[in-house]
Amino acid sequence: MSTFALIPAAGSGSRAPGERPKQYAALAGRPMLWHAVRAVCVPPVERAFVVLAPDDAHFAAEDWSAFGERLEPLWCGGQSRRESVYNGLVASRDQWDADDWVLVHDAARPCLPAQDLQALIAECSADAIGGILALPVADTVKKAAKDESGRHRILATEDRAQLWLAQTPQMFRAGLLVQALQRARGAVTDEAAALEQLGLKPRLVAGSRENIKVTWTEDLAMAESILTRRGESIR
């Protein structure tokens, strides 16, 4: 039984404008994707697959030599995260067993702390289903709807005691995840949602606020600050 990582990186990153896809944005001297790969290319993870768009011309222009044979690009990305993860698992099927663990990690999470990754692996390795890194919601959460003029109005206040913010990596048995993604219906924005549709209840492992997802342009400065403080900036 082994552990491998898979990073879906076929998106265009439309909310973080620029000439290059968001995952290749410069961050602490490297592309953001490089930092995401570095975060998961550590023991016990034996290999990392990066799922790219079929027409991706940026990956080959970057230096990935630090990862050696542990990193393998797959040009089989789909139109959605679900398609990209599923396609990546199918394309790499001859390199893993159904009981192996797969860690699916966002290309836009370059600041994953090492202790968060190790906590996830330690707490989920003996779990029958697997689980995800997540944060308990600290802010008050409002449910909203638009009024007749298009302005957002509060409908209700949600019980934040039951709410968590999903992060990555998300860790599941590879065979089970393929089955879940294959059967999933409707909008599936993360792997846990596909498992939920099978009636399963993945575990929640508390992560940290440093594991930010770079979504907006201003998030890049925050990620840069985190990496620089850790001494992971390359100049």
Q: What is each of the regions a protein language model found here?
A:
Residues 1-57, 71:
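N-terminal glycine-rich phosphate-binding loop and ensuing alpha1 helix
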Residues 1-4, 190-192, 209, 220-235:
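SAM-dependent methyltransferases
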Residues 57-63:
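Acidic helix N-cap motif at the loop->helix transition within catalytic regions
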Residues 65-100:
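Short phosphate-binding loop-to-helix
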Residues 94-98, 146-149, 226-235:
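Generic C-terminal helix-cap and adjacent flexible tail
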Residues 101-105:
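Short aromatic-hydrophobic micro-motifs that form the base-stacking/packing surface
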Residues 112-205, 235:
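Conserved core of the sugar-phosphate nucleotidyltransferase
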Residues 202-206, 212-215:
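Conserved active-site beta-strand element of glycosyltransferases/polysaccharide synthases
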